[in-house]
Regions:
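Short, non-transmembrane amphipathic alpha-helical segments
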Residues: 146-160
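Amphipathic interaction/junction segments at domain boundaries or subunit interfaces
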Residues: 46-147, 164-165, 171
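A broad structural signal for alpha-helix termini and local helix breaks/kinks
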Residues: 20, 32, 67-68, 111, ...
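N-terminal leader/assembly segments
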Residues: 1-69
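Beta-rich nucleic-acid/ligand-interaction surfaces
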Residues: 165-185
């Protein structure tokens, strides 16, 4: 079974509340399966693991349908929000201390802490350009790929070390490619 960390799950209702208010949260919660609704209404442990389909993908799909006219690219914004949440306080200072290349190396270790089983590799990491790949993630969904891309984009912005930053997803396991690939460019 593929699982998602509570650290990723806890940010979903936070994102809804910040962007659509309490009414948006209630509208979203009312459409969830009862057992999933109870998870989201409770205090979510960031150390707990959840079934990715039931507790993460379907609720995120619902968010996209309710508030973004079904556009899965909204998950990119969820990822950005998650980076702001996860990289705050002392971690934000730590992120700002390293170079972009250092952070990209670390991202390949950090991101797999959100999803299991998965692997992430960095086959290219040079000045101004890097490639990150996910060669193994059983049943990955496009929503997860977008969320990871948005997380990386925002995390790299937080470093404050790059200008003209772009993160582009160039391959997709969900679409049948041999890996999910992100190309990162900066100056």
């Amino acid at each position: 079974m593929v699982e998602v960390s509570g650290l990723a799950v806890v940010t979903v209702p936070m994102f809804v509340r910040e962007n659509f208010g309490d009414d948006g949260v209630e509208k979203w919660l009312s459409k969830l399966e009862p057992d999933v609704r109870e998870i989201y209404k409770s205090s979510i442990s960031v150390n707990k693991w959840f079934d990715i389909q039931k507790v993460f993908i379907r609720p995120t799909e619902l968010l996209c349908n309710l508030f973004y006219k079904g556009d899965f690219k909204a998950a990119w914004q969820f990822g950005r929000f998650s980076a702001d949440y996860g990289l705050r306080g002392v971690l934000r200072v730590f992120v700002k201390m390293g170079s972009v290349n250092y952070f990209i190396r670390r991202a390949s270790v950090v991101i797999p802490n959100y999803y299991t089983p998965m692997t992430m590799e960095v086959p290219t990491n040079e000045k101004g350009f890097a490639v990150l790949q996910i060669p193994h993630f059983p049943g990955i969904h496009r929503l997860v790929e977008y969320r990871i891309g948005g997380w990386m984009e925002r995390a790299l912005e937080i470093t404050g070390k790059s200008k003209e930053l772009s993160v582009e997803m160039t391959k997709s396991l969900a679409d049948g490619d041999d890996c999910t690939e992100y190309q990162v460019r900066w100056s």
